[in-house]
Amino acid sequence: PEVSVMSVGQSIEILKGMGLPVDVIARFGLEGMKGSHIIGHTRMATESAVTTEGSHPFSTGMDLCLAHNGSLSNHNRLREELKREGVKFNTLNDSEVAAGYLAWRLKEGDTLKEALESSLDVLDGFYTFVVGTKNGFAVIRDPIACKPAVMAETDDYVAFASEYHALDDLPGSANAK
């Protein structure tokens, strides 16, 4: 199995691997890690090859990462526009374009909220994004909410997923709000 470890910025470490989630957790020793938030993703590839590089989350900027459920129809055009702005891409994945767009907007001076709001007008398709920064994370859905997003909140955590089943094994999920 392929594994890729990247350190991005000062506060985010991106670990990518292919295989069952339980195997990837064991491979990286995630159970022993500490942090304020984690973004995980189980991918069903539709737009690009199944490779470690194509695995989520994606980052194209300091202390920013994105995981995506959905499909962007304008990612090829937007990728070319962002390349002209100096954004670098490592894959042909549409999710990396979304991460690149947000990183570019932040570099241009937008707040995360402004960048996310702008993405609703620029990114064409159906999607749910989870975006992680060094200070927290945000979830955003396309304007007509084609892709699901569910949330579980307890006194100890807040978790988002694209399906209820993904939250079943979290501690206290049966009593989550």
List where the protein language model places each region.
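Conserved short alpha-helical segments that host acidic/polar catalytic motifs at enzyme active sites
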Residues: 1-177
